[in-house]
Amino acid sequence: MKKILSVFAVLSISLGAFAETLDTDTVLKDPETVLKEYKIEIRNVNGPEDVNVRVFSKTYLYPAETIKEAIKARLEKEGLYTKKKDNGFFACMGVKYNPLWHKMLDFYINVVGSENAGTVNLLVSTGYDNYMDETNLTACLNAARWLSELEYDIKMYIFLNNLSAEDETLAGLQKDIEKLQKQKAKIEKKIETNAEKIKKFEAQRIKLTEDNVNNLDTKKLDREKEQDRKLQDEKNALNYDLNEVMLQIEVAEGKLAQQMEVIKKLKETEPKK
């Protein structure tokens, strides 16, 4: 008898848990509860075939165009590509897309709004003029979940776009530093060449001694002075250029470090599901 009671108790607990799972997940929810829980509206709009249809609708506080591009990016990632339809809708036709339905379907989306907010209208069809609305509990629940998941997709789309822009800025700074490093190497090479010229010139120039001081070729001395002046001017100019480019490198490396910090902090804001 105790064994029977124990089995009955376990069975009762299991059934209770099963009922709770069903209640929070699928069949024990009515469409009105689903729509309220997921903050979904049902709207009448002029549909893709120029007929009045009821759509699942949700508004997001992001630019409408951003929302549209985020949806297309998600669908492309899932292997689906859209076609333009009437009244601002785009569609995926004749596809198997389990998030919305377990069989072949067509689904249509349009996004309306402004720079401040956008509303997504979702229409699901299992055949010509066979549109599914909130009276179909499974379709209602699937649509509600899908529209709710879009919040993450939009955030991720914005995040990745921002990250791409910052990475592009970083790449530009790295390219600038590479150019400056090449300029620095060229200047240093010219400085080496200038130093060799000065060394060679000093070795060949007239040396003043007691024996030749009275019979020097003054014109040659003047030419040597002019050559010496040019070599020194070149040396000074090259050293100035080197200092300038090294300063530019220092500034660019500072910007690079700042940009890397910007990217690091941005990555910390990656949206979580």
Regions found by a protein language model. Name each.
Residues 1-24:
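Bacterial Sec-dependent N-terminal signal peptides
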